[in-house]
Structure formats: structure tokens, C-alpha cells
Amino acid sequence: FAPYLYGANYPHPLGGYGSGFQKWLWQAENGNFEPYTSCGNGSAMRVGPVGWAFNTIEDVLEYAKHSAESTHNHPEGIKGAQATAICVLLGRKGFGKEKIRSEISTRFGYNLNFTCDEIRDTYKWGGICQDTVPQAIVAFLDGNDFEDCIRNAVSIGGDSDTLACITGSIAEAYFGVPEEMYKEAFNRLTPHFKNVVTEFEEKFGNKILNNGNLTKKDV
């Protein structure tokens, strides 16, 4: 129900919604909240908070599934959300990149044995989890800090806003976000979303860096 509330309150976001979600909103307005069997990458791009709100792999898997299947109930849509949320959990818990790579490859069967340089010239646009979540994770794995990860994701091309969103959710948990970037993004939010973010971070934490030093942290 939450995706409908946000969609109804923000019907015309910059860039618009994906066609599947837009159709779902129209159906929901008439009382039909059935998910639309999507494996689109929207499930992965919105799931990052689950990796902050829960502290075990079992809980993160369960609630990432719940987050996804309200709209994206295709197995691949659920898997993409779960993989992203597990990356966030492991990143904020201090696990190394190779542990993250191994865990995701083993648990979800994603091939992460490539680099951004190797796919940049041939990667094509894809809007499903199978074509974006592994690439977004590798953009993080190849990065040296938060900004570097985002640049990697954008440089691949394709559905770059979603790629960068997925990559960024993992990179914050692992590296932290420079304070000036955090403030720039935060100040672009509506008052409602500023309140949502503030309340969430007060309860579950974040990683904000001031001159390389952690100023806020995981609670």
C-alpha cells in the first residue's frame, strides 16, 4: 500500500514512473492492489533502507522480499531486491568487498567476475534486475569511495539513474557519503521527504563523512 500512497501523492515526478508502475497506480486507484509480476529494477532501487533497518541476513531477506513483492513479485524482481539489501547490510557491518562479492554470487547466482571497464563499451540499456543489479554491484566493487562508485555506475550507461541509485545505496553503507553531497541531495527533497529521511536516519543511522571523518553512524 505504501508505494501507492507515494505514487498518488507524487503523480508527476521528474522523469516520470516506469510504465508498469504507472499502470499499477491506475489500477490501485480503482482498488486493485495486485502486484504486476515485474522483474523490473525498481524493486532493487528502493530497497536500500531494508539493509539499514534489520540486522540479520534472514530478516533482510524476508523484508526485502516484502518490499519487492508489493509490486515486483517476479522471482527475479525479488532476488534483485534481496541481493541489493544484503549488500547494504554487509557493507554497513564492515565486511570486505570480496566477502560481499562471494556472498552475493553464491547466494543469488549473479556473475560478478567482471569490471566496469570490461563492459562499458558493450553494455546496453536494460530495465530488469538481471541486467542491472549485477552491474550496479560491480560499480560499487570497482569504486574507491562513494563518488567513485557513482561515477562508475553512470559511466556504464543504460538505465544509469537506477544503476547509480542501487550502487549508491551500497556505497553509502560501505564508504559513507561526503557531507556536501548529502546536503545537496537532502536540500532538493520536499518537506515531507525531508521528514521521512530524518526520522528514518534518527532511528536506523546513516554514514555521513565530513572531511573523511564519520559524523553520523549506524545506530
Predicted regions and their residues:
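Structured, active/binding-site neighborhoods that engage oxygen-rich ligands
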Residues: F1-V219
